[in-house]
């Protein structure tokens, strides 16, 4: 029997079929935090706001952010350090006839030194076993600060109890909290 599993989801009015291997984060359903990030992004930039823009999805997983952004017309690069997730992302792109790059990478190591982006998105992992670890999010914020073009936009979604605000202020100066529900988009 195949290890592959699939599920469908409607995101911002469009249908997607996602594929995943066992052990992939949020397998079987789109994480509500990712949905909130996409809603905030569309409200902030408008329905055509990503078309033709270069987007980096840090910690892309199976593509909950990458696939919708690609369908909206963005040129998306999804980076992910978990190989099962990268394979899941590639299969999801094929199944939905979408184009994006899916790179197996520890943070941004697979990117060229000069790669810069108009928009960077992330729903960073923060659990290692049962512990809350912010090291990955710290690395993602550092990469976003280094890889964002002038005038670019960085979207990070997290649980409200995670205090990313001082880190964002240190790296970017000003930032806005766009949405707060069970998660917050910064």
Where on the chain are the PLM-derived regions?
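Class I S-adenosyl-L-methionine
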Residues: 1-5, 159-186
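SAM-dependent Rossmann-like transferase core, predominantly class I methyltransferases
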Residues: 1-50
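Conserved SAM-binding loop
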Residues: 78, 156, 177
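Conserved beta-strand signature within the Rossmann-like core of class I S-adenosyl-L-methionine
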Residues: 151-158
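A short SAM/SAH-binding and catalytic strip from SAM-dependent methyltransferases
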Residues: 119-131
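Short beta->alpha hinge that forms the Motif I/post-I loop of the SAM-binding pocket
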Residues: 80-85, 136, 159-160
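A short glycine-rich, Lys/Arg-flanked "PGG" loop and its adjoining helix->strand segment in the class I
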Residues: 138-150
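Conserved SAM/SAH cofactor-binding pocket of Class I
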Residues: 32-122
């Amino acid at each position: 029997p195949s290890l592959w599993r699939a599920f469908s989801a409607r995101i911002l009015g469009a249908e997607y079929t996602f594929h995943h291997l066992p052990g992939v984060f949020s397998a079987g359903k789109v994480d509500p935090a990712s949905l909130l990030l996409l809603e905030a992004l569309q409200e902030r930039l408008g329905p055509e706001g990503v078309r033709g823009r270069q987007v980096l999805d840090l910690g892309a997983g199976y593509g909950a952010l990458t696939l919708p952004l690609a369908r909206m017309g963005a040129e998306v690069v999804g980076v992910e350090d978990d190989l099962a997730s990268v394979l899941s992302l590639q299969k999801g792109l094929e199944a939905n006839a979408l184009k994006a790059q899916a790179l197996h990478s520890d943070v941004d190591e697979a990117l060229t030194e000069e790669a810069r982006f108009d928009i960077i998105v992330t729903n960073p992992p923060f659990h290692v076993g049962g512990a809350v670890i912010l090291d990955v999010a710290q690395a993602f914020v550092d990469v976003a600060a280094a890889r964002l073009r002038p005038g670019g936009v960085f979207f990070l979604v997290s649980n409200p109890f995670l205090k990313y605000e001082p880190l964002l202020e240190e790296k970017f100066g000003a930032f806005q909290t766009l949405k707060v529900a069970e998660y917050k988009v910064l």
